[in-house]
Each structure stands twice: as C-alpha cells, then as structure tokens.
Amino acid sequence: HVTGVQTCALPICDKLESLFPVIDADCSDSGSFDAVLEFMLMSGRSLQESVMMMIPEAWQSDVNMDQQKRDFYEFNSAIMEPWDGPASIVFSDGHYIGAVLDRNGLRPSRYYVTKDDKVIMASEVGVVHVDPSNVLLKGRLQPGKMFLIDFEQGRLIPDEELKRDISAKRPYGDWLAEQKVTLADIAKPDNILSLEDADGEDALLRRKQAF
C-alpha cells in the first residue's frame, strides 16, 4: 500500500516503491500472470516452486496425495490464491522449459517427445507433422500436473519427482503444526452465548438475529 510505504521508517522502505505496481492496471490475464511469476522469481523462489504456488493441484480433497506435497500446498495457499484459469501455461527461465495445466483441466495440452530429441506441445495433435515411427513418447497434460524439461540434465523430469523435491526442501508440515490457527482453536468469550447455549424464546431470538 502506498500509504504504508510513505510512512515506513525503515531504510528498506525507501526502495519498496520501485517494486510497485507488480501488475499494471491495463494488463491482460496472461500479462498479469507473467508479472507475478517474474516477481516471485526475483524474490528468490525457483521457477518450479513459483509455478506450483500459482497453479496448484486440487489438493484439499485428495486423500491419496503425498503428505509433504499436501503440506506444501496448504502452507502456500495462505500466501498465494490459485490462478484457476482456465489456463495452460508455458514457462521458461533459460534453464528449464515447461508447461502446467490448471486444476480444472479445461485447456487441452498434448505433447510428443521424438526419438531425435524434439518436444512438441500444442492444444491439438497434428499442429506439426511428426512421423509416427519417430515418436518416443506422447500424452496429454493432466489437471494440475506439470511438464518440465531440464536443459542442463537434458531430460524430462516427471511431475511426481519434481514436486517431491520441491515439497521436501522446507518443513512445511512443521510450520503448519506450529503456526496454523483454526476457528476451533480460538476460545469462545465467556460472555457470549452460542445458539446451543440458549433455550426457549432466547434461542428463537438468537436464531432470528443470526438469520
């Protein structure tokens, strides 16, 4: 906030104005996403971590999800609202190139990996002619999944591997256990009666007021 920056007495606050606005008012959806992703990269996060934060999987109800990955998503959900698109995003920082589909999965993203080390991704197959005999691998991005190529390693990194590595870098589960506060954790003031505590006409009045 501009007012907060103007009244800040710390030396670092003199430099904060150069960061804003992160998103220009007339920016498109794609431009806004690009601006926030670049901002997160400049803050020290890796490309993969930033994209995982911005376009998470549907983790809340997935009982089969690895606990470390669930902890990563839950912790970062307090920092970043999900960009649910619908969107299929392609990204690169010169060291990696990848793509991710938002968790609703409404944008088709199909890919070919050829035997002569080419990768082709588009909304539909056939955008670029590929000899079937030259196809090493083909598939489509699944909702919330990431497709990532590491230029330095020269390989395609599976979604499960890259997210496992990112999720294990910090003790997100410990942080949640220590710092997460839910409504059930907040003590009820002694002078406030809940609907369950009231009876008779008092209960009826409280229900009317609540309605």
Go through the PLM ranges and name each one.
Residues 11-45:
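Glycine-rich phosphate-binding loop plus the immediately following alpha-helix
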